[in-house]
Structure formats: C-alpha cells, structure tokens
Amino acid sequence: PNRHGGHGYTSPDVLEAGAKWAFSKGAGEVWIGDGPVWSMVGDSLNEYFRSSGLLDACERSGAKPLDFHAGEYRLFRPNHPDLPETIGFSEYLYQADVVISVPLMKTHFNTLVTLGIKNLKGCIRPADKLTFHTIELNAAIAEVNRLMAGLVTATVVDGSVAYEGMGPGGA
C-alpha cells in the first residue's frame, strides 16, 4: 500500500479476523501477505509490517507474515501494447491452496474506486507497479485481472473505513 495520507490499507483487525476465520474452517496454515511498492527489502519491509499493525495481527491470529517480493515471480506476457513486455506475479500465489484478497474500500484519483481488482497490484513486481502509474491505469488493472483469472478464490472488501473524495492521499 501507499501509506501517505493516513490509513489507506486494509485494517489489521479485519485481516486478523479473516485469519482466525480461516483457521476455524480448517486451514492448517494462514499467511497474511503484502507487497508494498515503497518498502522493497529487508528491514524496511519488516518495519512496514510492524508499523502498519500487520505483524501484531499475525501474532494474535497465528498467521504468518508474507513479503510477496521475497520470492520469485512468474512471468506473463500481457495482451496490451502499453504495458511492460512481461509482468511478474509473486510465485507465492501459485503455491497457495486458497487466495483471499482483502482490499480496503476507498476512492482513487485514477480509478474512482479501488476494490479487489486494484488490490492485486500488491502481488506484482515493484517495477511493474510503478510502470502502471505512468500508463493508462485502468487498462493495466484490467490486464492484471485477466492474467490472474481464476487465481483468487474470494474477495472480501474491508468496509471498516471508507474513503470519500480524491483518495488515497487526500481522502
């Protein structure tokens, strides 16, 4: 997530509740993952998980924190002339039995709202993420969702906080 302007990311309380729910339904292991573009390596990512409350949510629920950028990427060739030649998706997604996307309900100055479809940008390579904001973002998001079709099992929107206005920074 882009953490300027306040709470612009999924509530740790919602993620904690979701992890506990998954365990109650028989999950043997639950991972809470993120791939923030501003925090790409080592200690800064650990600091992000701590400062955002994700680490505490993991500890309280028994889930494990997962850095989508710590592993390899599965590469795909997009079907859109304005997109990068390849787009990399975190390999961790393909190792999971179930993938649940939990986006915050918020507005966005480029896309009007961001829900499940834009939330998946956390799973792609940082360089690809940055490129998406220099091209037609809606087309990029649509292509990401086409390439990831069938990968996400469910999307649960976090409505505990909702943005109004020019988000995410000015909402």
Where are the predicted features?
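N-terminal and secondary-structure boundary signal
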Residues: 1-171
